[in-house]
Amino acid sequence: MGRRYFKSLVYGPVFSNLGLLVFYEIFKFLEEALERHKDSLIGDLLIPGMARTIALESDLAHYLGEEWQKDYVMREEVSDYLKHLNQLEESDPYLLCPYVYHLYMGLFSGGQVLKAKRMLSLSSIAGLKEDDDGGEKPGYSVTNYGDVPIGSLKRQLKKAMNELAENLDEETREQMLVQSAKVFEMNNVIIGSVKGVDR
């Protein structure tokens, strides 16, 4: 996942039109799944302040217009990803946990650095700059966690994931390891569908 995952969310039209859009459905599904299973150990992974669905919708509305969903057609690669997640939830919801962990940890770890790089990149292209009052520029909600420290989110998610794994049987833990590798494969597929991202 690494560099390509982060890059797909950052630069120019890839960020505004494609990077956000292909991952929007994935984050939305995972957050809805966490809510569906909130009364189990899985629910512990939904750390307060972590959810990104509303932020993604805000950014997409900024870049694509308020009625962006009217003409939105899901990419086949994204549809396949969602089918895979649905199958996992039906067979064993705990197998969704590696997707939650890796996707959000990736956003936590790289989001702030890439936010700064994106600002520099877009300012050189379109003359964008931070608001005079120091406020958040519209379109950057996905990397804005407000007053919630990124380090705290990372520690809480890691702790919740470790505690969850400790309470599962060996077979389930092994299956989760398999899905941990699958996360990178699935992400690379949808990233590869985004034009302008190095393959």
Protein language model features and the residues they cover:
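Metal- and O2-centered redox machinery and metal/ROS homeostasis
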Residues: M1-R199
